[in-house]
Swiss-Prot record:
The keyword tRNA processing does not apply. GO terms for molecular function: arginyl-tRNA--protein transferase activity; leucyl-tRNA--protein transferase activity. It is an enzyme of class 2 (transferase). One of its GO terms (cellular component) is cytoplasm. It catalyses: N-terminal L-glutamyl-[protein] + L-leucyl-tRNA(Leu) = N-terminal L-leucyl-L-glutamyl-[protein] + tRNA(Leu) + H(+); N-terminal L-aspartyl-[protein] + L-leucyl-tRNA(Leu) = N-terminal L-leucyl-L-aspartyl-[protein] + tRNA(Leu) + H(+). Keywords: Acyltransferase, Cytoplasm, Transferase. Disulfide bonds: none annotated. Functions in the N-end rule pathway of protein degradation where it conjugates Leu from its aminoacyl-tRNA to the N-termini of proteins containing an N-terminal aspartate or glutamate. The gene is bpt. Its EC number is 2.3.2.29. This is Aspartate/glutamate leucyltransferase.
Amino acid sequence: MTSYWNFDFYLSPPQPCSYLPDQTATNLFADPEAAMDIARYSTLVRLGFRRSGRLVYRPRCLHCSACQPARIPVAQFRPNRSQRRAWKFNQDLSACYRPVEFRAEHFDLFRRYLGTRHPQGGMDDSTPEDYLNFIASGWNETSLIEFRDGKEQLLAVAAVDALTDGLSAVYSFFDPNAKKRSLGTYIILWEIGEAKALNLPYVYLGYWIKNSHKMSYKSAFHPLEVYQDKKWSILKET
């Protein structure tokens, strides 16, 4: 009998890297047919994996190790000046948990966000089915967190996975016209606060990539731990 903790893995064909120019990327995927649950997934996340929809993967590139799994140890986190400012500026926002299901209001915000922040990124022409397949897994405890202002206007949505040792920031999208609010920063700060309230030690942020503007911002959250050489350690940027 196959052990509950055993997985089969598959390597993807090489493809152009989405984050670094002139680089080729390959991913290691957990068997999509294997039964997955919060305990198994949490174990894989601690080993540097992440999910997109129901597919659980981690980068496994032959000549590059730029993608570093990253997490915030919430008990040690101390916001910097700009993060404190973003938190204070957004105190008029309310957060509400919603189940993962299609809402036209969410999808419209998702499309506007991608069209402005990531045009020609491969997702800005997503259909409702594409959107749900990207956000939902079908096997994990995922919530959509709505952030609304005092006029009940939807400004941001964060998809968050529950793990046995933390929260995993799956994806977030927000009003591209609300630049002064620094909503991307605020959402991560909210997730840190929520993990603390739930007595969970970590917020997992996916991958930190030093030379990618899309991914390097994560090192602004101190301390940041990265998974290297089969262990988590505090990132020391050089």
